[in-house]
Amino acid sequence: MSRLDLALRFYLALIVGFIFLPIFVSLLFSFNSDRFPTLPLGGFTTHWYQTIFADPDFWQAARNSLVVASSTALLATALGFCTAYTDYRYSFRGKSLFLAIILLPPTIPLIIIALAMLAWFARLGISGQIPSIIAAHTVLTAPFAMAIIRLRLSQIDESLEAAAWNLGASEWRAMRSVILPFCAPAIGSSLFLTAAVSFDEFTVAWFVSGLNKTLPVHVLEIVQGTIDPQVNAIGTLVFATSMTLVLIAQALIFFKLQRRAA
């Protein structure tokens, strides 16, 4: 093994450690019987999980997060599919500008998007409501859905759709019988990935949620001015949920590629 390979592996290990070590520490301290995050641990306990599960505010925030994440996933995936299919099927003047605008939100700092959303929703009179969080998260996540589905469409054999047309199928019927089944793995991946992004998103939700707090916003309220071990427990649950959704999305893509290779 060359020195370059060793250096690259060491660098990769540092990156992985930098990302996941704080998460592991949070998981570890979520079972610590001491109130303060110190080593050595005072002992093993599930008290902090029992505390949050008995907290009605936690369950309300969890319900809000689940409603927002599931609604966002459906809307973002639907918009992403429509945009991806438009890019795949049609050519029109201004198409490059159209795609640039669609893919713009991930490149804008979240604080700017949050302030713009807050001002816009306040003007519409819907600031602080669940639909406003869903709308904001849809804007944030739709570009990811579009990218996933468009990548899948780039792999389709165009003769399949042409064969459907030759057999008398309308464009809508060809889409339902050819395009949608072909894109099903990407659509499934998009649903889980956008749900994970929405479930874990804090900055925009903090500005537009008002009294309808999501779990990340609820965590911020807990940590303000105090050290509360509940934060480690809630953070562990949020991370586990988000990672589960992401892993499911990756698995859908992986197994589809495996079946194609076979």
Indicate residue ranges for each PLM-predicted region.
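N-terminal, non-cleaved signal-anchor transmembrane helix
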Residues: 1-56, 60-63, 67, 248-262
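C-terminal transmembrane helix and the adjacent membrane-cytosol boundary/short C-terminal tail
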Residues: 2-11, 21, 150-161, 165, ...
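Transmembrane-helix boundary motif in ABC transporter permease subunits
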Residues: 1-5, 70-102, 115, 119, ...
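A structural signal for multi-pass alpha-helical bundles of membrane permease subunits
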Residues: 21-34, 64, 114-124, 192-198, ...
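Hydrophobic alpha-helical transmembrane segments of multipass integral membrane proteins
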Residues: 59, 63, 67-79, 83, ...
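Transmembrane alpha-helices
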Residues: 11, 16-23, 114, 132, ...
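Membrane-interfacial helix termini and adjacent extracytoplasmic/periplasmic loops
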Residues: 37, 41, 46, 95, ...
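Interhelical loop and adjacent transmembrane-helix boundary motif
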Residues: 2, 34-36, 49-57, 199-250
